[in-house]
Amino acid sequence: MGAGSCGCGILNVSCAAQPSERFFAMKKLQIGLQTFETLITQSFAYVDKTGLLAPLVSQGGRYFLSRPRRFGKSLTCSTLDAIFCGRKELFDGLAISKTDYTWPVRPVVRFDFEQIDHDTPERLEQSLHNTINNMASKAGLVLSTQLLKEKFAELIVKLAEQGGPVAVIIDEYDKAILDHLANKTKADAMRELLRNFYGTLKSKDVDSNLHFVFITGVSKFSKVALFSELNNLNDLTMDGHAATLCGYTQAELELVFDKYIDALATEQNKTKAYMLDELRRWYNGYQFSKQNKKVYNPFSILNCFGKNDFSNYWFTSGTP
């Protein structure tokens, strides 16, 4: 297994090892399902990205990744959660199991803004309070502070005292803002609240208790606008080593979905080679680095195979 370092500080681990035979069969399609454990335990098709995650979780760091909607960001967050929780059995046969990762169990603080109420700034703040309180309760902790930013900090510090350096995973960090772009006053209020909230991660007491931070969303707001208090993020958005972290490569498409490609060819009464060309023409137009590493949109691919037909599935699924 080859390894080398890159300018962004990511250890570049070769992912040449192929998954075990249990991943080759024609499995169920996980349209809309973004929970790693469910995909693995209930025999859904899974495209293995764990070889790309292994160096990130091993060395730790603070990372930011922007990708379009329905591109696998939430599944990536769920996978990271399972890794840090030490769920080694779920990764049997996957690329990370062939690395020297030692599976330390770490406290995980995870926010999914798809699930957090953000109808108003007040409801967003209360929902964040509730989320933090729930995490503290599950860990058997009692938090003494009442202000949101201080409560977030106290949670991280106490979790670290209990179980070592913490992993923070924030999914859809920008959703509370994007959903209110038509109302500038409300969007600005959301942005200010979140700017202060995310700034918690930069404070000295908190930063020293962190192993890993991963923030992902659709947009890439300027540091001045949203991350002015959090300027130590390693931006993976256009980094070549993360170019295929979300989305399916050509090789992954043909490996994991080979039987679905055959079924599509049969349904369309075309050759397999023709179907591969059509899939490429319809869904292979995404590139997230200066390197020529193109990927397919997962949502479109899964819907195409599920319906055995071509359509603009991603475009018609919503905005942004």
Could you say what each language-model-derived stretch is?
Residues 6-8:
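Aromatic, loop-rich ligand-recognition surfaces of beta-strand-rich domains
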